[in-house]
From Swiss-Prot:
GO terms for molecular function: bacterial-type RNA polymerase holo enzyme binding; DNA-binding transcription factor activity; sequence-specific DNA binding. This is Multiple antibiotic resistance protein MarA. SUPFAM superfamilies: Homeodomain-like. Monomer. Transcriptional regulator. Represses transcription of genes belonging to the flagellar regulon, including flhD, flhB and fliC; probably thereby leading to repression of motility. Binds to regulatory regions of target genes, including the promoter of the flhDC operon. Represses expression of the flhDC operon in a post-transcriptional manner. May activate genes involved in the multiple antibiotic resistance (Mar) phenotype. It comes from Salmonella typhimurium (strain LT2 / SGSC1412 / ATCC 700720). Residues 29-50, 77-100 bind DNA. InterPro entries: Homeodomain-like_sf, HTH_AraC, HTH_AraC-typ_CS, MarA-like. Residues 12-110 form the HTH araC/xylS-type domain.
Length: 127
């Protein structure tokens, strides 16, 4: 098996694992530990395979999931912060506002949603 195929298989596995663990704190250290590669090597490999930085991909996926929950449910923002592994509601609010240019509570009540900022899951060659 070529190095390229091995890297692709590793990244596919990591993408699946990230999707299964979005509702927990996902640090680069935790993901690299899971992969068995150094943080530096995994980030390089991830960028090469997907065209996205690993940290930004994780943040984008979490923000997308939270945005969808805000549209689809009445779950409190504090609950979403805890559910998706943020240290506090304030941390989630700051991160969300930086990503969507509007705080979560305003995102929920307006009809203007940031679907163009959504990061859908990358899976098996759909990069």
């Amino acid at each position: 098996m070529s190095r390229r195929n091995t890297d692709a298989i590793t990244i596919h596995s990591i993408l699946d694992w990230i999707e299964d663990n979005l509702e927990s704190p996902l640090s680069l250290e935790k993901v690299s530990e899971r992969s068995g590669y150094s943080k530096w090597h995994l980030q390089r490999m991830f960028k090469k395979e997907t065209g996205h930085s690993l940290g930004q991909y994780i943040r984008s996926r979490k923000m997308t999931e939270i945005a969808q929950k805000l549209k689809e449910s009445n779950e409190p923002i504090l609950y979403l912060a805890e559910r998706y592994g943020f240290e506090s509601q304030q941390t989630l609010t700051r991160t969300f506002k930086n990503y969507f240019d509007v705080p979560p509570h305003k995102y929920r009540i307006t009809n203007m949603h940031g679907e163009s900022r959504y990061m859908l899951p990358l899976n098996h060659g759909n990069y």
